[in-house]
């Protein structure tokens, strides 16, 4: 399957730290992942070649459904050229120097996005992505195709029954572990103090709340509902709404976005509430992409390091 994509940087999008899911498995310039297409586990390989995304499924699935899934995950229907014009109008076109072609990387599984977003709180991208990969490997279903094994993300019912454990500060470097060591609880997957949050949120989503309701809700009501979940504060809720459900008004704020926004708007002294209100008013339905481009530019241009050192 060939999908015209225009300006799209597949690798940058995969590695931009969006909390929908870990980056897909890279193999010789292509990326592979297991998708569920009309109930069928289907590993796919995607490769970006000169404005065309080549999609190769490992099994026979309906092509229309597969195409729609890929277009959704990589937000290929979004008019990125229109967004570039918007950046120019807002005097933010400098972010294109390091971020051109970056798109949203949306969840293939909303529940995985919920857990990924909780796991990412106050945590490095490397650590939370490894944690999610461990959770998949331990409690997801294994699917092997052509000698390559992929794991689904476990259901809320499965994670509800997983032990929290007591290995909060486990060293994550596997070469420092005994050869017969095996992970058997959540904390040993590196989620630390978030383990009880993950279990309780899994229980709520298994027994009390249908996460699919979010799709049909407006942003404010959906955010209020998500804040009832264990381990979900304002930033995590906005990550779930953005990457899990593409609520474009969402503007996730963490310590780095806070510093970036105060850096580019000197004298405003934003707090989190005023920053979100400003972003929604100033950027409207482009707020999601503005946040994505601002953070990616700061990370790739060195601004993030300067802000960390207090020299920005």
Curated annotation (Swiss-Prot):
Keyword check for Protease: no
UniProt-recorded Gene Ontology molecular function terms: 8-oxo-7,8-dihydroguanine DNA N-glycosylase activity; class I DNA-(apurinic or apyrimidinic site) endonuclease activity; damaged DNA binding
InterPro entries tied to this protein: DNA_glycosylase, HhH-GPD_domain, HhH_base_excis_C, Ogg1, OGG_N, Oxidative_DNA_repair_enzyme
Compositional bias segments (type: Polar residues): 13-22
Region (Disordered): 1-22
Active site: 235
Entry's family note: Belongs to the type-1 OGG1 family.
Protein name as catalogued: Probable N-glycosylase/DNA lyase
UniProt lineage: Archaea, Methanobacteriati, Methanobacteriota, Methanomada group, Methanobacteria
């Amino acid at each position: 399957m060939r999908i015209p994509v225009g300006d799209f940087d597949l690798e940058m999008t995969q590695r931009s730290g969006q909390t929908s899911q870990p980056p897909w498995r890279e193999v010789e310039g292509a990326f592979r992942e297991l998708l569920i297409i009309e109930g069928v586990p289907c590993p796919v390989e995607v490769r970006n070649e000169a404005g065309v995304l080549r999609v190769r499924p490992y099994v026979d699935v309906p092509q229309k459904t597969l195409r729609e899934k890929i277009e959704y995950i990589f937000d290929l229907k979004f008019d990125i050229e229109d967004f570039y014009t918007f950046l120019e109008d807002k005097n933010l076109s400098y972010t294109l120097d390091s971020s051109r072609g970056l798109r949203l990387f949306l969840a293939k599984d909303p529940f995985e996005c919920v857990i990924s977003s909780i796991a990412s709180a106050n945590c490095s991208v490397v650590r939370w992505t490894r944690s999610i990969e461990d959770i998949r490997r331990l409690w997801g279903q294994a699917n092997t195709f052509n000698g390559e094994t992929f794991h689904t993300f476990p259901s809320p019912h499965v994670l509800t029954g997983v032990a929290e454990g007591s290995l909060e500060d486990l060293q994550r470097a596997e070469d420092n572990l005994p050869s017969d060591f095996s992970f058997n609880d959540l904390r040993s997957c590196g989620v630390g103090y978030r383990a009880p949050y993950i279990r309780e949120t899994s229980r709520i989503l298994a027994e009390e709340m249908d996460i699919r309701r979010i799709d049909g809700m407006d942003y404010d009501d959906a955010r209020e509902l998500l804040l009832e979940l264990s381990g979900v504060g304002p930033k995590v809720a906005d990550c779930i709404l953005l990457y899990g459900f593409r609520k474009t008004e969402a503007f996730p704020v963490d310590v780095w976005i806070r510093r970036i926004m105060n850096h580019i708007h000197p004298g405003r002294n934003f707090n989190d509430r005023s920053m979100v209100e400003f972003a929604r008013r100033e950027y409207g339905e482009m707020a999601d992409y503005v946040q994505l481009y601002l953070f990616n530019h700061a990370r790739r241009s060195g601004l993030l390091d300067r802000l960390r050192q207090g020299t920005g």
